[in-house]
């Protein structure tokens, strides 16, 4: 590639950004703002709504692990494209829900599409960028979560207002259709590895580049076993678990707390959620850069500390000031841990196995996510308040902070 010419890696990273907008922004984060209207439309209680979240995360967990390995073996392009098609179709079908069983099934399948698209997308920074720029590149991809959240927070309340009682159905239809359009764009432009374009990763020169393994995309079972045989990768997964368990309680019941418990309007909740999305669009870049400078361990610990404070503020300061303070703190830190964990996975297992490594540690993240909504919904039902679930989320986040401090630096 000539000096001054845009490296194709930046185009790939932008495709990763679009992928996370659809996969996480529409497939997961939109549920938070649609949840109150969906509750009224289907007459579900909070335990059922929490279980819908759990079903989504079980699907996510299943394909995050398998999808990471499939991307390492067969290529990121085909895996992400098929996953986005599945996600788009099931989002549309969610709008047809009439029963809990059907809604649970659709949220489960949406989760599968989310996991299979999101994990390979988050590993793109490790494949296309040198280690010294890996956190920054991964942060750009994770910015799609915030952008998708912002779009959902602005768009969904308008759809709900326009279509009344059935508005939540149209919200799913529109989000699903948009995801299918994104699938087509990503298929056209994304590439799995730099060698497909005759390039080295961004930030790597020919004199610095060691002889790579053969260019073929296939990864053997022996190489896969080396990923889950590393104790340091298991510990990385444990650190990631605390994020999955804590943040999802806050995310799932964010709008329901404001609307159902605090008596605020759907528009207010949507506006505050849009603020979270807007701020979080750039938080991955910020925290990826911080982890490039401070190291993954200290970067993760600092991020967990800020996240924990945001949950406690939301639970204890029940005023508009508290709600905005919590939203700002969370928005500026929301996707910090996924960004740092994705970069760390690449640090530990290398670029070719980055998707597989991230998929493996996502097992722990997904277990936390599967437990969080059900526990949060149960605690809200028995206490008739969201205060206890948010306090629990804060305590779990602080535990993640402590665990992060013992994360070992990978050997060069």
Q: What does each model-identified segment do?
A:
Residues 29, 57-65, 150, 277-285, ...:
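Residue-level signature of mid-helix packing/kink "hotspots" within the transmembrane helices
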Residues 31-35, 230-282:
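Extracytoplasmic gate region of multi-pass secondary transporters
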Residues 43, 75, 96-102, 130, ...:
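Helix-breaking motifs and short loop linkers at transmembrane-helix boundaries and internal kinks
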Residues 62-101, 291, 297:
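Conserved MFS/SLC helix-loop-helix module at the cytosolic interface between two early adjacent transmembrane helices
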Residues 86, 90, 101-109, 321-329:
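Paired small-residue
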Residues 106-144:
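Cytoplasmic helix-loop-helix junction between adjacent transmembrane helices
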Residues 140-195:
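Helix-loop-helix hairpin linking two adjacent transmembrane segments in secondary transporters
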Residues 274-284, 289-344:
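C-terminal transmembrane helical hairpin of 12-TM major facilitator-type secondary transporters
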């Amino acid at each position: 590639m000539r000096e001054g010419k845009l490296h194709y890696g930046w185009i790939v990273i932008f495709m990763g950004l679009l992928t996370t907008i659809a996969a996480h922004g529409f497939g997961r984060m939109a549920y938070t703002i649609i949840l109150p209207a969906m509750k009224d439309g289907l007459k579900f209680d909070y335990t059922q709504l929490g279980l819908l979240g759990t079903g989504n995360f079980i699907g996510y967990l299943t394909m995050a692990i398998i999808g990471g390995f499939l991307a390492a073996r067969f290529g990121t392009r085909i895996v992400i494209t098929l996953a986005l098609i599945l996600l788009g179709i099931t989002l549309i079908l969610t709008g047809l829900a009439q029963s809990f069983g059907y809604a649970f099934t659709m949220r489960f399948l949406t989760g599968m599409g989310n996991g299979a698209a999101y994990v390979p997308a988050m590993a793109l920074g490790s494949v296309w960028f040198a280690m010294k720029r890996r956190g920054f590149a991964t942060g750009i991809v994770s910015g799609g979560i915030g952008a998708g959240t912002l779009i959902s927070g602005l768009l969904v309340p308008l759809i709900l207002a326009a279509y009344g009682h059935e508005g939540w159905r149209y919200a799913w239809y529109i989000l699903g259709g948009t995801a299918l359009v994104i699938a087509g764009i990503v298929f056209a432009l994304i590439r799995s590895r730099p060698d497909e374009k005759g390039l080295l990763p961004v930030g790597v020169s020919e004199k610095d580049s060691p002889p790579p393994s053969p260019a073929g995309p296939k990864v053997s079972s022996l190489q896969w076993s080396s990923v889950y045989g590393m104790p340091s990768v298991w510990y990385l997964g444990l650190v990631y678990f605390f994020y999955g368990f804590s943040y999802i309680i806050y995310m799932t019941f964010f709008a329901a707390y404001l609307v159902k418990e605090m008596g605020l309007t759907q528009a207010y909740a949507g506006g505050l959620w849009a603020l979270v999305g807007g701020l979080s669009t750039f938080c991955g870049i910020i925290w990826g850069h911080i982890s490039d400078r401070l190291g993954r361990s200290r970067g993760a610990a600092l991020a967990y500390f800020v996240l924990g404070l945001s949950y406690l503020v939301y639970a204890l300061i029940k005023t508009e000031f508290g709600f905005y303070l919590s939203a700002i703190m969370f928005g500026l830190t929301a996707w910090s841990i996924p960004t740092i964990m994705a970069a760390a996975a690449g640090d530990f297992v290398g670029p070719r196995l980055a998707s597989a490594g991230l998929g493996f540690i996502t097992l722990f993240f997904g277990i936390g996510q599967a437990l969080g909504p059900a526990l949060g919904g149960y605690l809200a039902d028995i206490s008739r308040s969201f205060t206890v679930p948010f306090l629990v989320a804060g305590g779990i986040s602080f535990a993640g902070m402590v665990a992060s401090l013992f994360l070992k630096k990978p050997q060069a």
